[in-house]
Amino acid sequence: MRYYITGTRRGLGAFITNLPELNTGANRIVDNLDDCDIFINCKHDGFSQVDLLYEDESKGKKVISIGSAASDWIHGHKDVYKYGIEKAALRNANDQLYYVGSDVTCINFGYFDSERSADVDYPKMSLQQCWDTIKWVIDNPNRVKEITVCV
């Protein structure tokens, strides 16, 4: 399988990119969306994950978007809720595309052990646990619309 992964400089994207199993044999990481079989839509940058989801889905490839359990926490007017709104938009776009037959999945993780959540004092999943969930979706013979995984 050929994988295209966004957000590879740090956190979950960097962890996935450096996995030996994705850099040997028939598995490899490619440098652009057109050359992949599986797109892991990992980099959060405003609403850009939504745009990338629509762009790749139109090419008929499997897309796994890394959402967030924060997409359930979208009420209020504080800046902190903007992240949840952006992830809710990703979740809703995934929902729409799934129901028209696209092979898209949104995985909504709770906190996981990364630079971004280093100061958060809540239980966190390991990056390996996150990868194990992603791998389960990849290996599943059925389409998986969405899954939320938290500690």
Role assignments for model-derived ranges:
Residues 119-151:
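C-terminal helical subdomain
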Residues 10, 44-46, 69:
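Flexible cofactor-recognition loop at the NAD(P)H-binding site
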Residues 59-100, 111-119:
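Catalytic loop of short-chain dehydrogenase/reductase
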Residues 1-28:
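Canonical Rossmann dinucleotide-binding motif of NAD(H)/NADP(H)-dependent dehydrogenases/reductases
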Residues 5-6, 40-42, 62-68, 105-108:
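Structural signature of the Rossmann-like NAD(P)-dependent dehydrogenase/reductase core
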Residues 50-55, 91-97, 134:
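Short-chain dehydrogenase/reductase
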Residues 99-112, 143-147:
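Conserved Rossmann-fold SDR core element
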Residues 36-63:
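NAD(P)-cofactor binding segment of oxidoreductase domains
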